[in-house]
Amino acid sequence: MAKDQVRFLKEELADTIKEFELVEKSVYDSELAHAINTGGDVYDSLLKENALQIEDLLKKLSSKYGLKSEENPRPMMPEIKKFPLQYCLENALIPIGETDKVVEFGICVPNSLNALKNLSLMIGKKTSAKFIPPFYILQSIQQKHIHTEVDVPKSDLVKDKKEII
């Protein structure tokens, strides 16, 4: 299921790129033909060939949908009992911030906005959204958990300097 969802998201991203004309039509068509021949995705081909800048995609999505974007979000797990992680991953949402009243989610496709209202009812808090690079969401879906950064102090056993013998 995760592979199908990732493929669907990449197709949706490719359609969005075409709609916003973020790459030249000839380049898009060439990468589409290549993706069809190799069984890959247009989105991946465009990234691999450096034909697409994620920053441009985020700016276009932000301006069209009136939401902010963030290029370097910090995914996190909210302090909510029985947080609906599976629902979030199924709807391409990952939590990136939390206050007492609002949980902020990162999205990469506009269809994810439809799930925010139901999610708000599930968690009992207001929700807001920001567009983030698709990499974060695709990675979370593939590995079935939210990738968070952990601030772990270094152990006393780990030495900063290499010893010369």
Where in this protein do the model-derived segments appear?
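N-terminal, intrinsically disordered, highly charged
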Residues: 1-165
